[in-house]
């Protein structure tokens, strides 16, 4: 995009994925792609309209689109693996890969856990009812989320 170097600059969003010499990232509201860090060659890119970072594993990259669709792409070539429409228009956070789940928070303080395999709903956790304001993080064996009202919630598997 653009005709000169300045116009071609794009904002990359935090929340990237790295496996050996491959780094994958999302460009603000434009695309997702992977680059070989040794050669600098672009391995693949695909359109992806989102404003949060991505997460990944050896099989898939996960991201939230601007409209709330949660998507998975094949890490190897960017082909679409699955899309979940069930959380549309909920102002989702960026994703976290945790165990067998992709975890996102929403504007109502709910934490959603989707299957990494197919995007099916696995679980939903409640907080204080205010928006989750940052991408969930894992601290050891604890899932941690922060809400707009200042709540810090930790969830541990039983």
Task: Name every feature range the model reports, one short phrase each.
Residues 1-20, 43-58, 81-98, 121-140:
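Extracytoplasmic beta-rich repeat domains
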Residues 27-28, 65-66, 106-107, 147-148:
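Structural signature of WD-repeat beta-propellers
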Residues 36-39, 74-77, 115-119, 157-158:
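Short loop/turn segments that connect beta-strands within beta-propeller blades
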Residues 92-116:
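C-terminal hydrophobic structural anchor segments
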Residues 147-157:
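Short, low-complexity, Pro/Ser/Thr/Gly-rich segments in the mature regions of secreted, periplasmic
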């Amino acid at each position: 995009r653009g005709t000169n170097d300045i116009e071609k600059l794009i904002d990359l969003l935090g929340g990237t994925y790295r496996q050996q010499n491959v780094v994958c990232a999302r460009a603000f509201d434009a695309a997702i792609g992977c680059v070989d860090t040794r050669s600098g060659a672009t391995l693949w890119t695909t359109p992806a309209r989102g404003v949060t970072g991505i997460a990944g594993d050896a099989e898939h990259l996960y991201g939230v689109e601007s409209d709330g669709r949660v998507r998975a792409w094949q890490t190897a070539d960017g082909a679409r693996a699955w899309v979940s429409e069930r959380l549309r228009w909920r102002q989702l956070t960026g994703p976290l890969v945790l165990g067998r789940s992709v975890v996102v928070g929403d504007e109502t303080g709910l934490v959603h856990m989707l299957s990494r395999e197919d995007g099916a709903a696995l679980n939903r956790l409640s907080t204080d009812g205010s928006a989750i304001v940052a991408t969930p993080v894992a601290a050891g064996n604890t899932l941690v989320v922060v809400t707009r009202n200042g709540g810090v919630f930790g969830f541990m598997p039983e």
